[in-house]
Amino acid sequence: MAQRPEWVDHLIGWHVYPLGFVGAPMHPESQEVSHRLGHLEVWLDHVVALGCSGLVLGPVFSSASHGYDTLNYFTIDPRLGDDADFDHLLQAAHDRGLSVLVDGVFNHVSSGHHIAQDAQNAGPDSEAGRMVRWRDGQLDVFEGHGGLIALNHDNPAVRELITQVMNYWCDRGVDGWRLDAAYCVNPEFWAAVLPAVREKHPDCLLYTSDAADE
């Protein structure tokens, strides 16, 4: 079992849903970047004054609506800003002694994600088709939500993708991940992915909510 990072023992997190907090529209109106993360950054001194030691962010990656329907794991949602805005927020938080944790929505993707789109067009036997789940000849969805396409966690390509995503953002300065809907993902997937992340980032916090709270 991996040793828990020492900084976690005294972590008090301030949780915020960025898209709602900064007043972003429910759906992207265009791909034009709106630099809204600065509206969150101005609250960091207040977070410290409360006695918190961590900034816990809801979804920040490019999505089709509420943030849990990811379009691109490698870009910040343009309704929030761009990579430079996020890097600035990370630095501002770290300068104040705040750790930054982000939401990892790795059970499913938006129906508009290129993997889902390619799978739909090329079929279940295609490279993309093998990265998602199918039911009765159709793309399988998460708990009946038609816009959330379930990833196939038995596919090594999916494990490689999620490992790459997590390490990419940890390389940029993210200190930890909340694993959304982790209870839906087979344990063998996490047993392959999480050690690969901890090997490169041993102080990274990895956690999930109880299934009853999801």
Regions found by a protein language model. Name each.
Residues 183-191:
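An alpha-helix initiation/capping motif
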Residues 101, 176-182:
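Short catalytic-loop micro-motif centered on adjacent basic/acidic residues
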Residues 207-214:
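Conserved small/polar residues in nucleotide/adenosyl-binding loops
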Residues 3-13, 17-53, 60-172, 190-201:
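Substrate-binding/active-site clefts of carbohydrate-active enzymes
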Residues 56-59, 180:
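Residue-level recognition of beta-strand->loop/alpha-helix junctions
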